[in-house]
């Protein structure tokens, strides 16, 4: 569960993470439970958050 690993490493709750990356809490839950997988821009954003979290979070401010 890549999204969960990224979120936990950043220290965010599901709700905080959803707000930061501008997706619904339900979407975060679905990703983390394996019901859905991030695609497109969301998948790319998760990869950037994994590799360069400070840069990505600053850009999301």
Regions found by a protein language model. Name each.
Residues 3-16:
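Short basic helix-loop element that most often maps to the first helix and adjoining turn
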Residues 17-18, 28-31:
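Conserved hydrophobic/aromatic packing and binding residues within compact polymer-binding modules
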Residues 20-23:
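Long, hydrophobic/aromatic-enriched structural stretches that serve as scaffold segments
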Residues 30-61:
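Short, Lys/Arg-rich amphipathic alpha-helical interaction segments
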């Amino acid at each position: 569960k890549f999204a969960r690993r990224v979120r936990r490493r950043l220290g965010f709750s599901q709700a905080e993470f959803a707000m930061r990356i501008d997706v619904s809490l339900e979407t975060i839950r679905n990703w983390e439970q394996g019901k859905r997988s991030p695609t497109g821009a969301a998948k790319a954003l998760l990869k950037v958050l994994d590799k360069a979290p400070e840069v990505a979070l600053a850009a999301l401010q």
